[in-house]
């Protein structure tokens, strides 16, 4: 009989190490630890070791590292030919780090596929806003004039981007945000976007299943590369979303 296993209970010290990601449970897949806090130090430590928080209102903080891991190659986001035709005719523009709080608010109001409510609690929103103010969390925003119609946010360490959530205020807004993020990162030599857990929508956009061991190897390599934190706004500027049709996206 297989011994019953429980996730590790984290202490209150933000500097306390996580257990190895390989120690995560298989049922539920990837649950590694419970407790702790969402301080910037603990969050950055988690991501740098292939671990992320995911829990609902009323639950303790749950930390995960599933196997396999969903990722996007930054040159592998798929936009359909039909969508590209629509995009060529659009007047949407794309920016970075100019509306982070609006993006995370909109993501919190948009449940993940298969879920009735949001997993982005008020506590989580404040934690990622704090990371953004420190230059570690970033958003890509899609605008129709002055109106936000799509976005994605996540955490950057070294040359690894850990996607957290995205939303569409209008059809296709999240696709444009993801494609813009991927194109920008690919141009800067960043190979992967962490997409965390599998769902059909991500697969339709080109996400791949990566064995956890391979994912952790990539994380270890990429987070060790020097990439100073800070706002992406000036570096990214503002671009016409239609220009994504001319990138190397498949």
Curated annotation (Swiss-Prot):
Annotated Gene Ontology cellular component terms: cytoplasm
Superkingdom as given in the UniProt entry: Bacteria
Gene that this polypeptide is encoded by: aat
Primary subcellular site in the record, as a coarse category: cytoplasm
Function description: Functions in the N-end rule pathway of protein degradation where it conjugates Leu, Phe and, less efficiently, Met from aminoacyl-tRNAs to the N-termini of proteins containing an N-terminal arginine or lysine.
Keywords: Acyltransferase, Cytoplasm, Transferase
Compartmental location: Cytoplasm
Pfam family, one: Leu_Phe_trans
Family membership: Belongs to the L/F-transferase family.
Originating species: Xanthomonas euvesicatoria pv. vesicatoria (strain 85-10)
Entry's Gene Ontology BP terms: protein catabolic process
Region of interest (Disordered), ranges: 1-21
GO molecular function: leucyl-tRNA--protein transferase activity
InterPro entries documented for this protein: Acyl_CoA_acyltransferase, Leu/Phe-tRNA_Trfase, Leu/Phe-tRNA_Trfase_C, Leu/Phe-tRNA_Trfase_N
PANTHER family membership: LEUCYL/PHENYLALANYL-TRNA--PROTEIN TRANSFERASE, LEUCYL_PHENYLALANYL-TRNA--PROTEIN TRANSFERASE
Enzyme class: transferase
Upper lineage: Bacteria, Pseudomonadati, Pseudomonadota, Gammaproteobacteria, Lysobacterales
Protein name: Leucyl/phenylalanyl-tRNA--protein transferase
Keyword DNA-binding among UniProt keywords: no
EC identifiers of the protein: 2.3.2.6
Swiss-Prot/TrEMBL catalytic activity: N-terminal L-lysyl-[protein] + L-leucyl-tRNA(Leu) = N-terminal L-leucyl-L-lysyl-[protein] + tRNA(Leu) + H(+); N-terminal L-arginyl-[protein] + L-leucyl-tRNA(Leu) = N-terminal L-leucyl-L-arginyl-[protein] + tRNA(Leu) + H(+); L-phenylalanyl-tRNA(Phe) + an N-terminal L-alpha-aminoacyl-[protein] = an N-terminal L-phenylalanyl-L-alpha-aminoacyl-[protein] + tRNA(Phe)
